[in-house]
Design a protein with these regions (language model features):
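Right-hand nucleic-acid polymerase module
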Residues: 1-206, 216-352
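Cys/His-coordinated zinc-finger cores
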Residues: 212
Length: 352
């Protein structure tokens, strides 16, 4: 499967020079040839070439994640799991080749690459996070959404063991469904809900929890209001807990990129299972792989879901093809292909 994403070049700083002219001054037009030469020289020193931009992006973004991807592939080879060898091969081939389209004065576009779609893949997790961010940024900038107030909600419960994690994720999903049907939440007109999983490094327990952006009317706080204590009681009830869980709720003046990034981040941080010894990484991957396989961690409801249908054709924010640019204007551009060198750990340009 091929995907297309745009890599935007950093914009050159624009400098405007204002010249005050006296009434008796005569404006002299510069020689067009010398001016063109000067402009070209200025451009070459201030505007990086497309391939320079590509190399910078490869070094800063793609190569570190591909190295982690290769490490994870080796973990899957050693893992004692069904289908682990197949996933190891898919991981190794993920983003192995990157084809860019370049043209002078245009941002470089990645027009071909492959995705393994292994949930724990660092490359796919990164791209999935970008896709989620892009989708939600569009939705939350639409007039139908910006006219609402917004709340940022975090719902938690006690940690669980690795053996309990799968069942706990199912409980959380069912509890959220019950929560959204409660009369107390009739003031919530839409939401984005994501599930994040963190791991306690000392105990090895897992902490799945919900982050959500809630859209409420402008009258919220005057006519209706849900206190933090009420949120605790509601979550305890729908989760069937015998204690009051920790809950955080705060009003958001405006849904900014930072807010969207909070719900668009990785479902499981790669550092939780990659920055370990090979044996520990293998243990954690074996605990997580089957539990996370095939699960969705982002869901939309109410006006957020409706706007997503209008703006993004209803695609799930996690879909990697949200990074696809299908305008076709790059068809006649020059193509450059980079292949990952497993020995040196860098992408190298191929002759095509």
């Amino acid at each position: 499967m091929y995907d297309t994403i745009i890599i935007n070049a950093p914009q050159a700083q624009s400098i405007t020079i204002s010249t005050a002219k006296a009434a008796n001054n005569v404006e002299v037009s510069p020689d067009p040839v010398s001016q063109a030469t000067q402009d070209a020289a200025t451009t070459s020193t201030t505007q990086p070439l497309p391939e320079e931009i590509i190399k910078k992006r490869l070094q800063e973004q793609w190569e570190p994640k591909k190295k982690d991807n290769v490490f994870l592939s080796n973990i899957y080879i050693a893992a004692d799991m069904a289908n682990s060898k197949n996933k190891a091969t898919r991981l190794r081939n993920c983003a192995r080749w990157l084809e860019f389209a370049i043209a002078e004065g245009q941002p470089a576009k990645l027009v071909k690459t492959s995705s393994c779609h292994v949930r724990l893949c660092p490359v796919c997790q990164w791209r999935r996070s970008l896709a989620t961010f892009r989708t939600l940024a569009r939705v939350y900038s639409s007039p139908a959404v910006t006219r609402h107030k917004h709340l940022f909600l975090t719902l938690t419960q006690r940690n669980v063991s690795a053996a309990e994690l799968g069942a706990e994720l199912n409980r959380i999903s069912a509890a959220w469904s019950r929560l959204t049907r409660r009369k107390a939440l009739s003031c919530v007109k839409g939401y984005t809900k994501t599930v994040e999983i963190t791991r306690n490094q000392k105990t090895g327990e897992y902490h799945p929890h919900i982050h959500a952006i809630l859209s409420v009317p402008q009258s919220y706080g005057r006519k209706e209001y849900i206190t933090r204590r009420e949120w605790q009681e509601l979550w305890s009830d729908v989760m069937h807990l015998d204690y009051l869980p920790e809950v955080h709720i705060k009003a958001i003046k405006k849904v900014t990129g930072k807010t969207v990034a909070e719900v668009a981040k990785y479902s499981v941080k790669p550092a939780d299972y990659l920055s370990k010894s090979a044996d520990m990484a293998k243990k954690i991957v074996e605990e997580l792989d089957n539990v996370l396989d095939g699960k969705r961690f982002v869901s939309l409801g109410g006006i957020i879901s409706e706007e997503n249908k209008k703006i993004n054709n209803g695609k799930n924010p996690e879909d990697l093809d949200e990074l696809t640019d299908d305008d076709g204007d790059w068809i006649e551009w020059e193509k450059v292909v980079y292949e990952y060198n497993f020995g040196s750990g860098v992408y190298e340009r191929l002759s095509v």
